[in-house]
Amino acid sequence: MQNPFTTTFSKTPEYTYIHTEKTEEILENFIYDNPSESVYKITGVRGSGKTVILAKVEEELRTNESRYINWLVFDVNPARDILGQIGAMLVKAGFGSQDKKTTGIDEVSKSEEMVKFASEYGRWLRAGYPVYFVCTGLYENIQELSNVKNLTFFRRAATVKTEPLNMIRMTEMYKSKLDIDSDEAREMAKITKGYAYAFQELGVLCFKKKAGESLKDILMNI
């Protein structure tokens, strides 16, 4: 049987994804013809699920066409020419003037490419183009970029802070996917402290545990 848990960075778990209110907060805004928020900054400590939220938002906008109409999603590499990447993707997509265009960037920081993109994006917003931007980053990196001169829009943009995963949902997921009792599943959920990465990593290890190996044995080897 395939391991339902994954520790692959930036990959949305197919079988063990736990929905969060933060994800829905962003997606709910994008349902409307003219979303009230154009920019979201997803921030939190390492391992708290920032990238998973971004990946889920991008996935929903791309695939749920009945709910999100005329959306184009560009997932770009912040270490390369961001504007060049977006231009190439626009040409390939054959976009129309009514298409809403969302750029997703994981782990932003104050780099030359990011400042250049953000400055241009601010011009697009002022011109009234249907452009949207969702990014993730550590708090200090988000703050450093926010303090760049003339990036007022980014400084004032909606900030989404990651929160611990729901204890009950984690317990239920562990119980069903690992075929264990409620007490052990609850203990595992507590150990993760709600961190998305810890939830997946502990799930991976317990799925692969040997016969007779206990949770205590697994934790001693971490």
Map each language-model feature to its residues.
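Conserved catalytic segments around the Walker B and adjacent sensor/switch elements
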Residues: 39-41, 59-78
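C-terminal helical "lid" of AAA+/P-loop NTPase domains
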Residues: 186-191, 197-211
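Conserved C-terminal helix/linker of AAA+ ATPases
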Residues: 206-222
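Conserved small helical "lid"/interfacial subdomain of P-loop NTPases
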Residues: 157-185, 191
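Walker A/P-loop nucleotide-binding motif
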Residues: 36-56
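A short, basic N-terminal segment
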Residues: 1-38
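Active-site signature of alpha/beta-hydrolase-fold catalytic machinery across serine-
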Residues: 55-56, 60, 201
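Conserved Walker B catalytic segment
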Residues: 98-140, 147-150
